[in-house]
């Protein structure tokens, strides 16, 4: 039973230890000129791509979805690039470095969310939607209320995720490049705005693809060099790691990540359903031409991510063997220079020298840029498409909608920079956990039930969705992370760190109860529209850019 609970707790990749890669204390490193030069090459390449993309962005369709011309393979790479964060690369390899086997469960467990997207969501989402998941949620329900709720859910998730990434960017760049924190945050903010403002989804997609290729290449090379060192024998790798690790054989045993069964379930559910409710991930399914390509996207993305997280396991054990046993990477007190989260970076130095160290440092920074670009575009589309064009000013022209989207990108960029600076010394590890909980408690139930439950009504979706969102936020505030660690109270009112188990239940029960008891004429009409929606969700008939599949 403990192994099952350990695996469940492991499924939130950014929580606890992995989040520390972006939020823990950092020690500024000497200026790394190789890393800076390689990063500048990456920036120049991506700025050229943005310029190239800007010449091809002529319509709303181009801006939001790259014209629907991205292939399943390209989109799979871009999704992987959007999802493989610096926290998972540095944090999970650091967790393997310190805890051994637990890190494998931690790194692979989060993939549980992707089969849900593949089998339940990808095809119907592509057939029913155009630009945002609110298109799907509001397909047969009242546009105004549902789009407002979906946009609020999206913006809260984007804001929390964005703050965590910006603070993480500043601290990571302090670590890797020796640059000032404020300069780093401003640099990320400016580049993020340029990619999205001028290049839209096309530039964002190619930034994510390039980042994914670089990260997979870098991690593959590190894993190859580690395995070469041990004669390509996993037995030798584990034996040598056990010989030098302070915990000895204990690193090959599970346990130690779980406080209690409720926390384990809450973490597991938060990621499993949260992944299927992240607006910047869902938006990527509208960049392909049809449902077949959407399914292929998930297939490729899951393959790339699964491969990457297996590599982090090898990298973690390689770090135990080549970094942990080498005094050159330790300070006077015997701890790893820069902290345990630098294990993968030090391993890059150990297997590839200073040049490869510079490459991995630049890739870590590129990783953050790819993630924040996707978040910014998702936030901007929620405001311009869902709120402005479909709620506040119905009948707005494409030009007006694009103008609002680009103004929103600028505002999001400024706000992200200011909040990144404001939260510099705060514990922001909880923010990504909260983002996943809200995505799982508000966005996911509405998307799933709008596509699969014929009796869903606007009243049920609105009340249940808001209940889920508010429950997630309130329980998080009353929990040990915010109530005790941040606000300084003696004891938490809500005893568990993550609220997903409770807030998801509240959302689904609320949606079911208030839909089932809705006897209004509007509710009856919405139920009758389900058959037409079901036919389109299966066939794609009538969809823009739709092709046979």
From Swiss-Prot:
Protein's GO biological process: plasma membrane acetate transport; sodium ion transport
Superkingdom, taxonomy of origin: Bacteria
Pfam families from the UniProt entry: SSF (PF00474)
Keyword Membrane set for record: yes
Cellular localization per UniProt: Cell inner membrane
Coiled coil stretches, renumbered: none
PROSITE patterns assigned to the protein according to its UniProt record, in alphabetical order: NA_SOLUT_SYMP_1, NA_SOLUT_SYMP_2, NA_SOLUT_SYMP_3
Main localisation: membrane
Membrane topology: Multi-pass membrane protein
TM spans (from-to): 33-53, 76-96, 103-123, 149-169, 183-203, 206-226, 262-282, 303-323, 355-375, 404-424, 428-448, 463-483, 493-513
Alphabetized HAMAP family for the sequence: Acet_symport_ActP
Family: Belongs to the sodium:solute symporter (SSF) (TC 2.A.21) family.
Stated role: Transports acetate.
Name the record gives this protein: Cation/acetate symporter ActP
Annotated organism of origin: Enterobacter sp. (strain 638)
